[in-house]
Amino acid sequence: MRKIIIIGLCVIACAPSPPTQSPPRVQTVAAAPPVNTEETAVAPDAVADSLLADVRSYDSTIVVDLRYATSNNFTGAPLPGYGANHAYLRREAASALARVQKDLNPRGLGLKIFDGYRPVRATLAMVDWTERVHRPDLLTDGYIASRSRHNLGLAVDLTLIELPSRRELEMGTPFDTFSAAAHTANASGLAATNRQKLKSAMEAEGFVNYDQEWWHYTFSVPNPLRFDRPIR
């Protein structure tokens, strides 16, 4: 009996221990870089250079009067980032706008651009101006935006002109009128007719009107990016 116990203990004691298992290897996965959309950071200037195009490189007959490059705008001074009278848009939007111009020309009409791509710094300057002149209502009422589709190169402010005189058609209010009179539907007579002409021509090529501003149209592309590249 004693021998059996000893043997039993020996069996237990001498039994080989199970091999030590290494802890499972944890694979580390690099975090994906943040997608740069209109809600995140500004894209590098090199990216802007590859995606933005001068509208007149698609159709040189489009007239450009970039108001924010001059003192002829609601702030009374040129805005930061506007160093030249060149209207830029995303290439897709610039191409579509050239088609609008081509559609209008047989009717003796053309486009005149007041603003296209807008550097982020210019938008921030507009917001700062509203604070200096105590006009927060312009932000809350939707006339000035702290984040604008102009920063994406996907918005354009424009009107119709007669050709070859380049005379602007009657639209009821000047560009950048901050009142209900500028709402696209708030016009009658000749102004209403001309606003509808512009709207129909722009919508035919994929642009969408902002109903509080008869002059403001937007275009859509997948994964839009914000830019701050100066206009030069």
Predicted features along the sequence, with ranges:
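Hydrophobic h-region of N-terminal signal peptides that target proteins for export
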Residues: 9-15
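Extracytoplasmic cell-surface/polysaccharide-interacting catalytic and binding patches
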Residues: 15-116, 128-212, 221-232
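Segments that shape or occlude catalytic/ligand-binding pockets
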Residues: 119
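Short, well-ordered surface patches within globular domains
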Residues: 122
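Thiolate-centered catalytic microenvironments shared by cysteine-dependent enzyme domains
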Residues: 125
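Conserved metal-phosphate-binding beta-hairpin within the catalytic cores
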Residues: 217
